[in-house]
C-alpha cells in the first residue's frame, strides 16, 4: 500500500501502533520529529528531506512536522487496513472521518 501524507507545521500524526503492518516512510519535503516507543524505550529522531525510516509491527510511533509550511511524507506499507491502527488516544478510533482518502484508478 502506498500513501502520501501532507502535514502542516506543528501538525501531529498521532501516537499509534500496528499489530501486523510494517511501514516505511520517505521524507519527500520538510522536516519531522519522530518519536518511537519500543520495549519501554523512547527514541527521538529528527528526519529531513531524503531520510527514510521503517517501523515494525508493535512499535508505538508518532511524528510532528517541524518545518514551515509543513512536510510531505510517502508511506509504503505491507498492506492497508483501518482495523490494524491502534491509537493511544482511544477517541481517535471513534472518528470515522479522521482521514481523507483519494483513489487513483
Language-model region placement:
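A short glycine-rich, His/Asp/Glu-containing loop-to-beta-strand
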Residues: 1-15, 21, 76
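Structural motif
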Residues: 31-33, 52, 60, 70-72
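Short acidic-glycine-tyrosine-enriched beta hairpin
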Residues: 38-61
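Double-stranded beta-helix
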Residues: 64-105
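Tight coil/turn sites that cap or link beta-strands
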Residues: 8-12, 50-52, 56-58, 68
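Glycine- and acidic-residue-biased ligand/ion/polar-headgroup-sensing regions
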Residues: 19-38
Amino acid at each position: 500500500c502506498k500513501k502520501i501524507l501532507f502535514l502542516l507545521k506543528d501538525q501531529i500524526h498521532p501516537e499509534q501502533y500496528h499489530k501486523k503492518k510494517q511501514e516505511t516512510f520517505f521524507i519527500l519535503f520538510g522536516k519531522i520529529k519522530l518519536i518511537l516507543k519500543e520495549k519501554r524505550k523512547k527514541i527521538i529522531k529528527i528526519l529531513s528531506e531524503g531520510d527514510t525510516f521503517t517501523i515494525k509491527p508493535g512499535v508505538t510511533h508518532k511524528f510532528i512536522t517541524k518545518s514551515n509550511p509543513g512536510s510531505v511524507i510517502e508511506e509504503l506499507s505491507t498492506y492497508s487496513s483501518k482495523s490494524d491502527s491502534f491509537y493511544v488516544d482511544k477517541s481517535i478510533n471513534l472518528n470515522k472521518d479522521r482521514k481523507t482518502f483519494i483513489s487513483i484508478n
